[in-house]
Curated annotation (Swiss-Prot):
The gene is slc49a3. Pfam families: MFS_1. It is a multi-pass membrane protein. The chain crosses the membrane at residues 38-58, 69-89, 105-126, 134-154, 175-195, 201-221, 258-278, 290-310, 326-346, 349-369, 388-408, 428-448. It comes from Danio rerio (Zebrafish). It comes from the Eukaryota. Coiled coil: none annotated. The keyword Transmembrane applies. Keywords: Membrane, Transmembrane, Transmembrane helix, Transport. It is found in: Membrane. This is Solute carrier family 49 member A3.
Amino acid sequence: MEGESAETEPLIQSSSAADRPDPAAEAAARFTVYRRRWFILSVLCLLNCSNAMAWLTFAPVAGQSAQLLCVSLPLVNWLSLVFVLAAVVCSFSSMWVLDTLGLRCSLIGSSWLNACGCVLRVCGVLSVTPQWAVFAVVMCGQTLCALAQPLVIFAPTKLAALWFPDHQRATANMLASMANTVGLLLANLLSPLIVSYSGDLFLLLLIYSIPAAVACLLATLGIHQAVPPTPASASSSSSASEPFLQGIRQLLRNRAYWILLLCFGSGIGIFTCFSTLLEQILCVKGYSNGFAGVCGAVSIVCGVAGAFLLSLYVDRSKKFMEVMKICMCLTSVSCSAFAVVSQLPAQSVLLVLVCCCFGLFGYSVYPVGMELSVETTHPLGEATSAGLIFTSGQIQAALYLLLLQALATPTHSPTSVCAADTSLNWTVPVLVMAGVCAISSCVFVVFFHTEYRRLRAEADSATEPEPTGDAADA
Protein backbone atom coordinates (compact mmCIF):
# COMPACT_ATOMS: atom_id res chain seq x y z
CA MET A 1 0.00 0.00 0.00
CA GLU A 2 1.37 3.41 -0.95
CA GLY A 3 2.62 5.60 1.82
CA GLU A 4 3.02 2.76 4.25
CA SER A 5 6.23 1.35 5.63
CA ALA A 6 6.21 -2.03 7.25
CA GLU A 7 8.41 -4.53 8.94
CA THR A 8 7.62 -7.79 7.18
CA GLU A 9 8.53 -11.40 7.67
CA PRO A 10 9.70 -13.66 4.79
CA LEU A 11 7.50 -16.57 3.87
CA ILE A 12 9.60 -19.73 4.13
CA GLN A 13 8.87 -21.91 1.14
CA SER A 14 7.62 -25.46 1.54
CA SER A 15 10.03 -28.18 0.48
CA SER A 16 7.47 -29.40 -2.05
CA ALA A 17 6.60 -27.24 -5.05
CA ALA A 18 3.20 -28.91 -5.20
CA ASP A 19 2.34 -27.32 -1.88
CA ARG A 20 2.39 -23.92 -3.60
CA PRO A 21 -0.49 -23.90 -6.09
CA ASP A 22 0.24 -20.32 -7.16
CA PRO A 23 3.57 -20.23 -9.03
CA ALA A 24 3.66 -16.44 -8.75
CA ALA A 25 3.94 -16.70 -4.99
CA GLU A 26 7.70 -16.85 -4.75
CA ALA A 27 10.16 -16.04 -2.02
CA ALA A 28 9.07 -12.41 -2.25
CA ALA A 29 5.69 -13.24 -0.71
CA ARG A 30 5.49 -11.73 2.78
CA PHE A 31 3.15 -11.34 5.72
CA THR A 32 2.54 -7.99 7.39
CA VAL A 33 0.70 -6.84 10.48
CA TYR A 34 -0.70 -3.31 10.47
CA ARG A 35 -1.14 -0.98 13.40
CA ARG A 36 -4.60 -0.03 12.18
CA ARG A 37 -5.80 -3.48 13.32
CA TRP A 38 -5.93 -2.07 16.85
CA PHE A 39 -8.12 0.81 15.67
CA ILE A 40 -10.55 -1.58 13.98
CA LEU A 41 -10.56 -3.75 17.10
CA SER A 42 -11.29 -0.69 19.26
CA VAL A 43 -14.21 0.29 17.03
CA LEU A 44 -15.63 -3.23 17.22
CA CYS A 45 -15.24 -3.27 21.01
CA LEU A 46 -17.07 0.05 21.35
CA LEU A 47 -19.79 -1.08 18.96
CA ASN A 48 -20.21 -4.42 20.75
CA CYS A 49 -20.36 -2.73 24.16
CA SER A 50 -22.87 -0.14 22.93
CA ASN A 51 -25.10 -2.78 21.36
CA ALA A 52 -25.11 -4.83 24.57
CA MET A 53 -26.08 -1.73 26.56
CA ALA A 54 -28.96 -1.15 24.15
CA TRP A 55 -30.04 -4.77 24.58
CA LEU A 56 -30.22 -4.57 28.37
CA THR A 57 -31.31 -0.94 28.71
CA PHE A 58 -34.75 -1.64 30.14
CA ALA A 59 -34.37 -5.01 31.93
CA PRO A 60 -32.76 -3.63 35.13
CA VAL A 61 -35.53 -0.98 35.39
CA ALA A 62 -38.42 -3.00 33.98
CA GLY A 63 -40.98 -1.77 36.51
CA GLN A 64 -40.14 1.91 36.06
CA SER A 65 -40.00 1.45 32.28
CA ALA A 66 -43.49 -0.05 32.25
CA GLN A 67 -44.82 2.95 34.16
CA LEU A 68 -42.98 5.56 32.10
CA LEU A 69 -43.90 3.94 28.78
CA CYS A 70 -47.48 3.28 29.96
CA VAL A 71 -47.38 -0.39 28.96
CA SER A 72 -47.48 -3.75 30.73
CA LEU A 73 -44.42 -5.54 32.06
CA PRO A 74 -44.59 -8.32 29.41
CA LEU A 75 -44.36 -5.66 26.68
CA VAL A 76 -41.28 -4.20 28.38
CA ASN A 77 -39.74 -7.67 28.37
CA TRP A 78 -40.16 -7.73 24.59
CA LEU A 79 -37.72 -4.83 24.36
CA SER A 80 -35.07 -7.39 25.36
CA LEU A 81 -36.59 -10.47 23.74
CA VAL A 82 -36.54 -8.79 20.33
CA PHE A 83 -32.75 -9.22 20.39
CA VAL A 84 -33.07 -12.99 20.81
CA LEU A 85 -35.64 -13.13 18.02
CA ALA A 86 -33.47 -11.04 15.69
CA ALA A 87 -30.41 -13.20 16.42
CA VAL A 88 -32.26 -16.32 15.28
CA VAL A 89 -34.07 -14.80 12.30
CA CYS A 90 -31.13 -12.81 10.93
CA SER A 91 -28.31 -15.20 11.74
CA PHE A 92 -27.86 -16.68 8.26
CA SER A 93 -28.11 -13.34 6.49
CA SER A 94 -25.55 -11.87 8.91
CA MET A 95 -23.15 -14.75 8.29
CA TRP A 96 -23.54 -14.25 4.54
CA VAL A 97 -22.86 -10.52 4.82
CA LEU A 98 -19.70 -11.05 6.88
CA ASP A 99 -18.27 -13.88 4.79
CA THR A 100 -19.34 -12.52 1.38
CA LEU A 101 -19.50 -8.72 1.53
CA GLY A 102 -16.72 -8.45 4.09
CA LEU A 103 -15.84 -7.04 7.48
CA ARG A 104 -15.92 -3.35 6.51
CA CYS A 105 -19.45 -3.52 5.12
CA SER A 106 -20.61 -5.43 8.20
CA LEU A 107 -19.11 -3.05 10.74
CA ILE A 108 -20.28 0.12 9.01
CA GLY A 109 -23.76 -1.29 8.38
CA SER A 110 -24.19 -2.56 11.93
CA SER A 111 -22.88 0.70 13.40
CA TRP A 112 -25.49 2.67 11.45
CA LEU A 113 -28.28 0.30 12.47
CA ASN A 114 -27.19 0.54 16.10
CA ALA A 115 -26.80 4.33 16.08
CA CYS A 116 -30.08 4.97 14.26
CA GLY A 117 -31.86 2.63 16.65
CA CYS A 118 -30.47 4.41 19.71
CA VAL A 119 -31.37 7.84 18.32
CA LEU A 120 -34.88 6.65 17.43
CA ARG A 121 -35.35 5.47 21.03
CA VAL A 122 -34.51 8.98 22.22
CA CYS A 123 -37.02 10.45 19.77
CA GLY A 124 -39.65 8.08 21.14
CA VAL A 125 -39.54 9.58 24.63
CA LEU A 126 -39.46 13.24 23.57
CA SER A 127 -42.34 15.37 24.84
CA VAL A 128 -43.50 16.05 21.26
CA THR A 129 -44.15 12.33 20.67
CA PRO A 130 -47.83 11.40 21.18
CA GLN A 131 -48.34 9.11 24.14
CA TRP A 132 -49.90 6.39 22.00
CA ALA A 133 -46.78 6.30 19.80
CA VAL A 134 -44.11 6.30 22.51
CA PHE A 135 -43.74 2.55 22.94
CA ALA A 136 -44.05 1.88 19.21
CA VAL A 137 -41.23 4.31 18.38
CA VAL A 138 -39.02 2.94 21.17
CA MET A 139 -39.67 -0.62 19.98
CA CYS A 140 -38.78 0.35 16.40
CA GLY A 141 -35.48 1.78 17.64
CA GLN A 142 -34.84 -1.30 19.75
CA THR A 143 -35.52 -3.50 16.72
CA LEU A 144 -32.92 -1.64 14.64
CA CYS A 145 -30.38 -2.21 17.41
CA ALA A 146 -31.39 -5.88 17.52
CA LEU A 147 -30.82 -6.25 13.77
CA ALA A 148 -27.27 -5.00 14.27
CA GLN A 149 -26.46 -7.54 16.98
CA PRO A 150 -25.72 -10.63 14.83
CA LEU A 151 -23.34 -8.64 12.62
CA VAL A 152 -21.53 -7.41 15.73
CA ILE A 153 -21.51 -10.71 17.63
CA PHE A 154 -20.20 -12.71 14.67
CA ALA A 155 -17.44 -10.23 13.74
CA PRO A 156 -14.68 -10.94 16.34
CA THR A 157 -13.49 -14.23 14.82
CA LYS A 158 -13.48 -12.65 11.36
CA LEU A 159 -11.46 -9.64 12.51
CA ALA A 160 -8.98 -11.81 14.42
CA ALA A 161 -8.48 -14.14 11.46
CA LEU A 162 -7.95 -11.40 8.87
CA TRP A 163 -5.96 -8.72 10.68
CA PHE A 164 -4.04 -10.43 13.50
CA PRO A 165 -1.08 -12.86 13.47
CA ASP A 166 -1.57 -16.31 14.95
CA HIS A 167 -0.08 -15.39 18.34
CA GLN A 168 -2.62 -12.56 18.84
CA ARG A 169 -5.83 -14.04 17.43
CA ALA A 170 -7.31 -15.43 20.65
CA THR A 171 -6.52 -12.19 22.51
CA ALA A 172 -8.16 -10.07 19.80
CA ASN A 173 -11.20 -12.36 19.80
CA MET A 174 -11.39 -12.14 23.59
CA LEU A 175 -11.26 -8.33 23.66
CA ALA A 176 -13.97 -7.95 21.02
CA SER A 177 -16.21 -10.67 22.49
CA MET A 178 -15.90 -9.61 26.12
CA ALA A 179 -16.82 -6.03 25.17
CA ASN A 180 -20.36 -7.36 24.85
CA THR A 181 -20.20 -8.70 28.40
CA VAL A 182 -18.84 -5.37 29.67
CA GLY A 183 -21.81 -3.67 27.99
CA LEU A 184 -24.21 -5.92 29.87
CA LEU A 185 -22.42 -5.10 33.12
CA LEU A 186 -22.59 -1.34 32.45
CA ALA A 187 -26.29 -1.53 31.64
CA ASN A 188 -26.96 -3.40 34.88
CA LEU A 189 -25.14 -0.70 36.84
CA LEU A 190 -26.07 2.48 34.96
CA SER A 191 -29.76 1.98 34.13
CA PRO A 192 -30.97 1.91 37.77
CA LEU A 193 -28.69 4.82 38.74
CA ILE A 194 -29.73 7.09 35.87
CA VAL A 195 -33.45 6.37 36.13
CA SER A 196 -33.46 6.88 39.90
CA TYR A 197 -31.61 10.18 39.41
CA SER A 198 -33.63 11.61 36.51
CA GLY A 199 -37.01 9.99 37.07
CA ASP A 200 -37.53 9.46 33.32
CA LEU A 201 -36.08 7.57 30.36
CA PHE A 202 -34.89 10.52 28.27
CA LEU A 203 -31.54 11.00 30.01
CA LEU A 204 -30.94 7.23 30.09
CA LEU A 205 -31.54 6.78 26.37
CA LEU A 206 -29.61 9.94 25.50
CA ILE A 207 -26.53 8.74 27.41
CA TYR A 208 -26.74 5.29 25.81
CA SER A 209 -26.91 6.84 22.34
CA ILE A 210 -23.52 8.58 22.75
CA PRO A 211 -21.24 5.50 22.45
CA ALA A 212 -23.41 4.23 19.58
CA ALA A 213 -22.97 7.50 17.69
CA VAL A 214 -19.22 7.58 18.36
CA ALA A 215 -18.82 3.98 17.14
CA CYS A 216 -20.78 4.82 13.98
CA LEU A 217 -18.63 7.88 13.29
CA LEU A 218 -15.37 5.98 13.82
CA ALA A 219 -16.47 3.03 11.70
CA THR A 220 -17.69 5.18 8.82
CA LEU A 221 -14.69 7.50 8.68
CA GLY A 222 -11.92 5.22 9.93
CA ILE A 223 -12.43 1.77 8.39
CA HIS A 224 -11.38 1.86 4.74
CA GLN A 225 -10.58 -1.78 3.96
CA ALA A 226 -12.20 -5.13 4.65
CA VAL A 227 -8.86 -6.95 4.58
CA PRO A 228 -5.26 -5.77 5.07
CA PRO A 229 -3.21 -5.06 1.93
CA THR A 230 -0.93 -7.98 2.83
CA PRO A 231 -2.17 -11.02 4.81
CA ALA A 232 -1.31 -11.13 8.50
CA SER A 233 -0.85 -14.91 8.41
CA ALA A 234 -0.91 -17.84 6.01
CA SER A 235 -4.49 -18.76 6.89
CA SER A 236 -5.94 -15.27 6.44
CA SER A 237 -5.39 -15.39 2.68
CA SER A 238 -7.71 -18.42 2.45
CA SER A 239 -10.40 -17.09 4.80
CA ALA A 240 -13.92 -17.81 3.51
CA SER A 241 -12.52 -19.57 0.46
CA GLU A 242 -15.70 -21.67 0.09
CA PRO A 243 -19.03 -20.27 -1.23
CA PHE A 244 -21.49 -19.59 1.58
CA LEU A 245 -24.04 -22.36 0.90
CA GLN A 246 -21.32 -24.89 0.12
CA GLY A 247 -19.65 -23.94 3.40
CA ILE A 248 -22.89 -24.56 5.30
CA ARG A 249 -23.18 -28.02 3.76
CA GLN A 250 -19.60 -28.83 4.72
CA LEU A 251 -20.23 -27.70 8.29
CA LEU A 252 -23.23 -30.00 8.57
CA ARG A 253 -21.01 -32.94 7.54
CA ASN A 254 -18.38 -32.14 10.18
CA ARG A 255 -18.97 -34.43 13.18
CA ALA A 256 -16.67 -32.54 15.53
CA TYR A 257 -18.40 -29.28 14.68
CA TRP A 258 -21.82 -30.78 15.46
CA ILE A 259 -20.61 -31.74 18.94
CA LEU A 260 -19.18 -28.25 19.48
CA LEU A 261 -22.36 -26.67 18.11
CA LEU A 262 -24.62 -28.55 20.51
CA CYS A 263 -22.45 -28.69 23.63
CA PHE A 264 -20.94 -25.20 23.48
CA GLY A 265 -24.31 -23.83 22.37
CA SER A 266 -25.85 -25.50 25.41
CA GLY A 267 -23.34 -23.69 27.60
CA ILE A 268 -24.32 -20.36 26.06
CA GLY A 269 -27.97 -21.20 26.68
CA ILE A 270 -27.29 -22.12 30.32
CA PHE A 271 -25.57 -18.80 30.96
CA THR A 272 -28.42 -16.91 29.32
CA CYS A 273 -30.80 -18.65 31.72
CA PHE A 274 -28.50 -17.86 34.65
CA SER A 275 -28.39 -14.16 33.79
CA THR A 276 -32.13 -13.94 33.10
CA LEU A 277 -33.43 -15.88 36.10
CA LEU A 278 -30.84 -15.01 38.77
CA GLU A 279 -32.96 -12.39 40.56
CA GLN A 280 -36.06 -14.62 40.54
CA ILE A 281 -34.11 -17.61 41.88
CA LEU A 282 -32.54 -15.66 44.75
CA CYS A 283 -35.42 -13.44 45.90
CA VAL A 284 -37.47 -16.37 47.14
CA LYS A 285 -34.66 -17.23 49.59
CA GLY A 286 -34.49 -13.71 51.00
CA TYR A 287 -31.76 -12.19 48.81
CA SER A 288 -32.47 -8.65 47.62
CA ASN A 289 -32.42 -7.40 44.04
CA GLY A 290 -29.28 -5.45 44.89
CA PHE A 291 -27.52 -8.59 46.07
CA ALA A 292 -28.62 -10.46 42.94
CA GLY A 293 -27.12 -7.63 40.90
CA VAL A 294 -23.86 -8.00 42.82
CA CYS A 295 -23.79 -11.74 42.08
CA GLY A 296 -24.37 -11.08 38.39
CA ALA A 297 -21.72 -8.36 38.29
CA VAL A 298 -19.16 -10.54 40.09
CA SER A 299 -19.70 -13.39 37.63
CA ILE A 300 -19.19 -11.03 34.68
CA VAL A 301 -16.08 -9.37 36.11
CA CYS A 302 -14.50 -12.74 36.91
CA GLY A 303 -15.46 -13.98 33.45
CA VAL A 304 -13.76 -11.03 31.73
CA ALA A 305 -10.63 -11.48 33.84
CA GLY A 306 -10.58 -15.21 33.16
CA ALA A 307 -11.10 -14.67 29.43
CA PHE A 308 -8.12 -12.33 29.32
CA LEU A 309 -5.83 -14.85 31.02
CA LEU A 310 -7.09 -17.82 29.02
CA SER A 311 -6.70 -15.97 25.73
CA LEU A 312 -3.10 -15.08 26.52
CA TYR A 313 -2.45 -18.73 27.38
CA VAL A 314 -4.02 -20.30 24.29
CA ASP A 315 -2.37 -17.70 22.03
CA ARG A 316 0.95 -19.14 23.13
CA SER A 317 0.14 -22.79 23.82
CA LYS A 318 -2.55 -23.42 21.14
CA LYS A 319 -4.21 -25.87 23.55
CA PHE A 320 -7.77 -24.97 22.60
CA MET A 321 -9.32 -28.39 23.26
CA GLU A 322 -7.62 -28.91 26.60
CA VAL A 323 -8.70 -25.48 27.88
CA MET A 324 -12.26 -25.98 26.65
CA LYS A 325 -12.65 -29.40 28.23
CA ILE A 326 -11.20 -28.38 31.59
CA CYS A 327 -13.26 -25.19 31.78
CA MET A 328 -16.49 -26.92 30.78
CA CYS A 329 -15.96 -29.51 33.53
CA LEU A 330 -15.28 -26.81 36.11
CA THR A 331 -18.31 -24.88 34.86
CA SER A 332 -20.57 -27.88 35.41
CA VAL A 333 -19.17 -28.27 38.95
CA SER A 334 -19.83 -24.56 39.61
CA CYS A 335 -23.35 -24.86 38.19
CA SER A 336 -24.06 -27.82 40.47
CA ALA A 337 -22.75 -25.83 43.44
CA PHE A 338 -24.99 -22.91 42.48
CA ALA A 339 -28.00 -25.24 42.29
CA VAL A 340 -27.39 -26.25 45.92
CA VAL A 341 -26.24 -22.97 47.47
CA SER A 342 -28.93 -20.84 45.79
CA GLN A 343 -31.57 -22.79 47.70
CA LEU A 344 -30.00 -21.99 51.07
CA PRO A 345 -30.96 -18.78 52.90
CA ALA A 346 -28.39 -16.52 54.59
CA GLN A 347 -25.39 -17.80 52.61
CA SER A 348 -24.38 -14.54 50.93
CA VAL A 349 -20.61 -15.04 51.01
CA LEU A 350 -20.78 -18.60 49.73
CA LEU A 351 -23.23 -17.59 47.00
CA VAL A 352 -20.98 -14.78 45.77
CA LEU A 353 -18.04 -17.21 45.70
CA VAL A 354 -20.03 -19.75 43.66
CA CYS A 355 -21.16 -17.06 41.20
CA CYS A 356 -17.54 -15.94 40.92
CA CYS A 357 -16.45 -19.47 39.96
CA PHE A 358 -19.41 -19.88 37.61
CA GLY A 359 -18.44 -16.74 35.72
CA LEU A 360 -14.70 -17.42 35.88
CA PHE A 361 -14.95 -20.82 34.20
CA GLY A 362 -18.06 -20.28 32.09
CA TYR A 363 -17.93 -16.77 30.64
CA SER A 364 -14.17 -16.88 30.13
CA VAL A 365 -14.25 -19.86 27.77
CA TYR A 366 -16.49 -18.10 25.21
CA PRO A 367 -13.72 -16.54 23.05
CA VAL A 368 -11.67 -19.75 23.26
CA GLY A 369 -14.68 -21.73 22.04
CA MET A 370 -15.17 -19.38 19.12
CA GLU A 371 -11.53 -19.75 18.12
CA LEU A 372 -11.86 -23.52 18.42
CA SER A 373 -14.84 -23.41 16.04
CA VAL A 374 -12.64 -21.72 13.44
CA GLU A 375 -9.85 -24.26 13.95
CA THR A 376 -12.37 -27.08 13.53
CA THR A 377 -13.86 -25.76 10.28
CA HIS A 378 -11.02 -23.95 8.45
CA PRO A 379 -10.98 -22.82 5.64
CA LEU A 380 -14.73 -22.15 5.88
CA GLY A 381 -15.85 -18.65 6.78
CA GLU A 382 -15.15 -17.61 10.37
CA ALA A 383 -18.45 -15.77 10.73
CA THR A 384 -20.39 -18.83 9.61
CA SER A 385 -18.76 -21.28 12.02
CA ALA A 386 -18.98 -18.90 15.00
CA GLY A 387 -22.40 -17.56 14.03
CA LEU A 388 -24.07 -20.95 13.93
CA ILE A 389 -22.80 -21.69 17.45
CA PHE A 390 -24.19 -18.40 18.77
CA THR A 391 -27.51 -19.09 17.04
CA SER A 392 -27.57 -22.58 18.57
CA GLY A 393 -27.00 -20.99 21.97
CA GLN A 394 -29.89 -18.55 21.49
CA ILE A 395 -32.28 -21.30 20.40
CA GLN A 396 -31.29 -23.54 23.30
CA ALA A 397 -31.59 -20.58 25.69
CA ALA A 398 -35.19 -20.02 24.60
CA LEU A 399 -35.99 -23.72 25.06
CA TYR A 400 -34.31 -23.88 28.46
CA LEU A 401 -36.08 -20.73 29.65
CA LEU A 402 -39.46 -22.18 28.71
CA LEU A 403 -38.61 -25.49 30.41
CA LEU A 404 -37.23 -23.99 33.63
CA GLN A 405 -40.12 -21.57 34.03
CA ALA A 406 -42.60 -24.40 33.46
CA LEU A 407 -40.90 -26.46 36.19
CA ALA A 408 -41.01 -23.60 38.72
CA THR A 409 -44.01 -23.88 41.03
CA PRO A 410 -45.70 -21.19 43.19
CA THR A 411 -44.57 -21.13 46.80
CA HIS A 412 -45.15 -19.14 49.98
CA SER A 413 -41.69 -18.94 51.50
CA PRO A 414 -41.46 -16.87 54.72
CA THR A 415 -38.04 -15.60 53.66
CA SER A 416 -39.19 -14.38 50.24
CA VAL A 417 -38.55 -10.76 49.25
CA CYS A 418 -40.04 -11.20 45.77
CA ALA A 419 -42.76 -8.90 44.51
CA ALA A 420 -46.29 -9.91 45.44
CA ASP A 421 -47.52 -13.17 43.87
CA THR A 422 -44.20 -13.81 42.10
CA SER A 423 -42.53 -16.23 44.54
CA LEU A 424 -41.66 -19.50 42.83
CA ASN A 425 -39.90 -22.64 43.98
CA TRP A 426 -36.80 -22.97 41.79
CA THR A 427 -35.33 -26.10 43.41
CA VAL A 428 -36.20 -28.46 40.56
CA PRO A 429 -35.38 -25.98 37.74
CA VAL A 430 -31.87 -25.20 39.04
CA LEU A 431 -31.15 -28.92 39.46
CA VAL A 432 -32.30 -29.52 35.89
CA MET A 433 -30.07 -26.65 34.74
CA ALA A 434 -27.11 -28.22 36.53
CA GLY A 435 -27.93 -31.60 35.00
CA VAL A 436 -28.06 -30.19 31.47
CA CYS A 437 -24.74 -28.43 32.05
CA ALA A 438 -23.13 -31.63 33.35
CA ILE A 439 -24.42 -33.75 30.46
CA SER A 440 -23.18 -31.24 27.88
CA SER A 441 -19.75 -31.16 29.51
CA CYS A 442 -19.47 -34.95 29.65
CA VAL A 443 -20.50 -35.36 26.01
CA PHE A 444 -18.00 -32.71 24.93
CA VAL A 445 -15.11 -34.17 26.94
CA VAL A 446 -15.69 -37.74 25.77
CA PHE A 447 -16.65 -37.28 22.12
CA PHE A 448 -15.07 -34.04 20.90
CA HIS A 449 -11.80 -34.55 19.04
CA THR A 450 -10.51 -32.50 16.14
CA GLU A 451 -7.35 -31.44 14.41
CA TYR A 452 -6.45 -27.77 14.34
CA ARG A 453 -7.02 -27.24 10.64
CA ARG A 454 -6.03 -23.59 10.52
CA LEU A 455 -2.77 -24.17 12.38
CA ARG A 456 -2.01 -27.16 10.17
CA ALA A 457 -2.66 -25.12 7.03
CA GLU A 458 -0.29 -22.43 8.25
CA ALA A 459 2.37 -24.98 9.12
CA ASP A 460 2.06 -26.58 5.69
CA SER A 461 2.28 -23.31 3.78
CA ALA A 462 4.75 -21.30 5.81
CA THR A 463 6.75 -20.97 8.98
CA GLU A 464 6.23 -17.41 10.13
CA PRO A 465 8.61 -15.89 12.72
CA GLU A 466 6.97 -13.68 15.31
CA PRO A 467 6.67 -10.15 13.89
CA THR A 468 9.21 -7.72 15.31
CA GLY A 469 7.13 -4.66 14.52
CA ASP A 470 3.92 -3.34 13.08
CA ALA A 471 3.33 -1.59 9.81
CA ALA A 472 3.20 2.16 10.12
CA ASP A 473 -0.04 3.21 8.46
CA ALA A 474 -0.15 6.35 6.45
